[in-house]
Regions:
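Polysaccharide-binding surfaces and accessory modules of carbohydrate-active proteins
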Residues: 10-13, 17, 31-271
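Terminal leader/tail segments of proteins
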Residues: 1-7
Length: 271
């Protein structure tokens, strides 16, 4: 199986032929990113989440919420709850308050990949792809957020998407929604993107990953030849034969933002 769940450890393991992606659940129900890299042989563990490490001072981590959330490696961060890095989902309620906090509710693993209604998307047979859907809920807003991960084993690709549903009686405004997030420790990464113009698309641009935010985007209603909807983190000296590359690429895009943020703890968030 490409996707495994370890109930005792509260871990999901997604395997392609050469890579492993691991998702873990904190005791509070936050969905966290544990690992993405070369294929793991055997069960993973939760310790990379570092949930009990002191966030700022050499004292016991008492789970003070704002300091905990501002360093926890989220799978899908939301705005207005204490994680001050870039969020993937911002919701405003009918009273004008902005905030959304989602917790794990349930999961489903199945063969194949469901289509994205109204959008072009990757596809595959039940023999080619396996999908994990993690359902999260905000109990205050009655909001459901479904995180979808489809594993194309032979291609070493994991595709991601998100669905949001308002199950309450109050109107909610979606101010921002991104497809995915990847939180990682910094490994002296450089940022790589593709720029161009008419007749000379897809030129490689690579440089230092600075503290703060760096992004590529298009507001033209299409992905554009000026900025391609692609961003990657690469280790120094990477070329087509060696090095580590962690990349995100839209299958299709109108307006888009691809952003990388290096934070105070020297971790990296890519959305």
């Amino acid at each position: 199986m490409a996707i495994l769940y370890y109930d005792e450890k509260k871990l999901f393991q997604l395997n392609t032929e050469n890579t492993t992606y691991v998702i873990g659940l904190s005791p509070e129900g936050y969905v966290g990113h544990v690992y993405y890299g070369p294929l793991l042989h055997g069960e993973p563990d939760l310790y990379p989440l570092r949930m009990d490490e002191p966030p700022f001072t050499p004292s016991v981590n008492k789970r003070e919420k704002s300091s905990f959330l501002d360093r926890f490696p989220m799978e899908y961060p939301t705005g207005g709850v204490g994680d001050y890095r870039e969020s993937c989902l911002n919701i405003r309620n009918a009273q004008g308050r902005m905030g959304c906090e989602i917790f794990f509710d349930s999961y489903e693993i199945f063969k194949g990949k469901r289509p994205l209604t109204g959008l072009p998307a990757s596809f595959g047979t039940e023999d080619e792809v396996e999908t994990l859907e993690i359902t999260c809920k905000d109990p205050v807003l009655d909001l459901v957020v479904v995180l979808s991960y489809s594993v194309f084993t032979k291609e070493n690709v994991i595709t991601r998407s998100v669905r949001v549903k308002n199950e309450g009686s109050e109107a909610l405004k979606v101010e921002k929604i991104y497809s995915a997030c990847l939180d990682m420790d910094n490994e002296d990464f450089e940022i790589l993107s593709l720029h161009g113009s008419w007749g000379r698309e897809r030129h490689i641009q690579q440089g230092a990953l600075r503290y703060g935010k760096q992004l590529v985007s298009s507001g033209k209603g299409e992905s554009s030849h000026q900025e391609h909807p692609f961003v990657a983190l690469v280790t120094p000296g990477t070329d087509q034969e060696r090095g580590e590359v962690y990349a995100m690429h839209f299958v299709y895009s109108g307006n888009f933002i691809g952003q990388v943020e290096r934070c105070q703890f020297d971790t990296v968030r890519m959305v």
